[in-house]
Regions:
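Bacterial N-terminal signal peptides that target proteins for export
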Residues: 2-14
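Secretory targeting and sorting signals
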Residues: 11-25
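Sec-dependent signal peptide cleavage junction
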Residues: 21-39
Length: 199
């Protein structure tokens, strides 16, 4: 009986992994993605990758607060894709403010591309929010590295991160999901109290 339960569990895990790989590949995000967080599955992993000036799309997903993009290289972000680990009843949607175009009229979701490629347009700001039946159980935090300003403060749950009206490019981004109401991510290296949005 015990062996049967163990086999069912292994089968369920394999099915979930296959669904994840299928979702990742369907949305154009590399299947080299892997999922891990140090909290033992208390909250969903978030993966993201950016399209960087003169480099194109990053080949693999960046996870859970790590930096996607470049710092100190003077390269603009041109587009982004974001995806949340399945199985938690949570999805993600996002939109960007694009050079000479302004805010996208529609929100992109679950691995879709927000921004442009091949047009040499910089991203200037971003909004990200959770969707799904369990969206109110978590907060999504994100911050950007902006031209001239460096790392800005953390934004969360659909608020704006970046700049507008200043012609400043986004250069890098960090995104993390945590249980609702827990403390915000460590503010370093941005100074405590640094605004998430400059305009």
């Amino acid at each position: 009986m015990r062996g049967k339960k163990c086999w069912k569990r292994v089968t369920a895990v394999l099915m979930a992994f296959m669904m994840l790989v299928g979702l990742v590949m369907t949305n154009g995000i590399t299947s080299e993605a892997y999922w891990y967080n140090s909290e033992g599955g208390r909250y969903p992993n978030v993966g993201y990758r950016t399209h960087v000036q003169s480099k194109g799309w990053e080949r693999t997903l960046t996870l859970n607060g790590r930096t996607s993009g470049t710092v100190g290289a003077g390269k603009r972000l041109e587009a982004i894709q974001i995806i949340v680990e399945p199985g938690y009843g949570v999805g993600v949607e996002y939109r960007t403010h694009i050079q000479s175009k302004g805010w996208e009229k529609t929100w992109k979701k679950d691995g879709e591309t927000s921004g442009t490629s091949g047009e040499a347009k910089r991203l200037e700001a971003i909004q990200i929010r959770l969707t799904g039946t369990n969206k109110n159980k978590y907060d999504i935090y994100y911050r950007v590295h902006a031209q001239t300003y460096g790392w800005l403060g953390w934004a969360k749950n659909g608020s704006i991160a970046g700049t507008s009206g200043l012609a400043k490019r986004l250069e890098a981004i960090q995104i993390v999901i945590i249980p609702k109401g827990e403390h915000a991510p460590n503010p370093l290296p941005a100074a405590p109290g640094t605004a998430a949005y400059v305009h």
